[in-house]
Structures are given as C-alpha cells and as structure tokens.
Amino acid sequence: MRLGGPVFVESDDPEVLARAHRDLGYRAAYTPGGLTAGDTARIKAVRDAFAKHDVIIAETGVWNNLMDPDEDARRKNLSAVIEGLALAEELGSLCCVNIAGGFSASFWAGPHPKNFSQAAFDLAVENARTIIDAVKPKTAKFTYEMMPHMIPDSASRYLDLVQAVDRDAFGVHLDAVNAINSPYAYYDTTAVIRECFEKLGEHVVSCHLKDISMEDDITVRLTEVLAGQGGFDIRSYVSGVAGLAHKPPLMLEHLKSPAEYERAREHVLSVARDIGVSFDD
C-alpha cells in the first residue's frame, strides 16, 4: 500500500520533490504545482524523477464549480478540468479529481437546495461525459470527490453516477469522511466505510484520509480534525483499502503544518501496524 501527502520544500526540482516524499515515508504524491498539459519536457522530468524513487502521482486536483450558475464561469471551469484530465493522462497521474459542483452563487463548494436534485445529477453526468470524451484518456480516470452537501454524498449515489456516466474512464475518488454528514453517520462511521467499499471498491482510484469530530453544541457541527482525534474509524478505512486488489493510495490532506502532517502520518502508520498493513510494499 501507499501513503502520501503534501511536502513542504522550497524547490520545483522534480528530483528534490520526489526525494522529499520518500524522506517522509510517502510513496504517493499530489500533482506538483506549475504543470500544464502539453509541457512535455517538464512533465517527463517529473514522471522520470518520481518513477525513479517509486512515488506514484495519486491525483491531479482541479477545484472549481462545474455547476456554477454563471454560464461563462461554468464553461471556463469545464475547460480547466478538461485540461486537468489531459495533464493527468500525460503525467501518469491515477486520476483528475474535482467536486461535481452545486448551484450556490456565493461559495464554489457551498450548499444549495437544488444540489441533490435530478437536475444536479443530470448535469454531473453530462459534465463527466463531456470531460472524458474531450480527452479520451487511456489510463487516467476522471473522478468526483464525495461531498457532504452535494452529489455524490453517499456510496449509493456515487454508484448511481458511475452507472449513469457509463464511461470506463470514470472512476471513484473516495473521501469517506465527506460522507459523514449526520449524527447517524457519525456514530456509525464503520457502516459508512463498509458500504463504500462494498459498492464502490473496484472503481476506487485514490482515497483521502482524515478524521472528523462532532462538536458539543445544540446544532449539528461536524469538523475535520487531525487523524486520531475524531470519531472516524480509521482502522476500518485502512483495512478496506488494503483489502482491494489494486491497492489505491491513501492521501493525507487539509492540515495546517508539517508538524500536523507528521502527527497524522504517525497515527495512520500506528493503526496500520496494529492491523498488519504495511505501506512499504
């Protein structure tokens, strides 16, 4: 299995970046910044350096709103994701990932009453097909990240999308913490995780790994926290990934400093050791 996360180095040298990942025990990486599709020499340098050090590129993130209410913005966002998938294909990244999007005009990843509508589902399908058909990737997948207040918000809804998009190049980016969007889910994260792997396992390309806590308050407040400080069943999550034949990478994210990433990494490694899972092979 492979664990990955951001590295904090002041260099854009591919060799330095690749070694920085291995120095942290990472064998998976996010796409380095500054790359664009068609930059053949730079892309080759990154591919060669990362392959030399046995570090795979887990995902190429393009974060925008593919359902932006502004039509001009939506078209520009769609073009950016098409370029992102083209880059992922050239780079050898496992996937290009974005959110499916929503109808909020105030926040690109915000809630909206129509985010779970049939119109949203149909647009998510249309956008995925448009992106994939424009690039026609042979290896990289296009994926949506699971989100708590827009589709796909659950394993079942993600499976519906996989079936509706009906493209071999459409895969699953698994972030099961984002499917913890109610007290019911929070108090049985194990069941949420189990459903994700049962319904989506064969389609999973890359996974985010973090934790979540429900705060003491009258209203429901769910907050991302450092791995090991919340209620997410990391043990079951790591075990679920390890149980997949193709062993998709696990990627740490959304932490504030190298020190926090180190603490999260050590916790995940400790959990993995307890269940007999190795990130070294």
Regions found by a protein language model. Give the residues of each.
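N-terminal small/glycine-rich loop or linker at the start of catalytic domains
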Residues: 1-4, 58-67, 103-111
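Hydrophobic faces of well-ordered beta-strands that scaffold small-molecule active sites
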Residues: 2-7, 29-31, 57-62, 96-98, ...
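Acidic-and-aromatic substrate-binding clefts and catalytic sites of carbohydrate-active enzymes
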Residues: 7-15, 31-43, 65-72, 104, ...
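Active-site acidic/histidine proton-transfer and metal-coordination neighborhood
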Residues: 15, 52, 71-172
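Acidic (Asp/Glu)-rich catalytic clusters
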Residues: 17-24, 38-59, 83-92, 129-137, ...
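Conserved, mostly hydrophobic/aromatic
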Residues: 21, 29, 50, 77, ...
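Acidic/histidine-rich catalytic cores of soluble enzymes
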Residues: 29, 60, 126-226, 231, ...
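C-terminal helical cap(s) of enzyme catalytic domains, especially alpha/beta-barrels
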Residues: 261-280
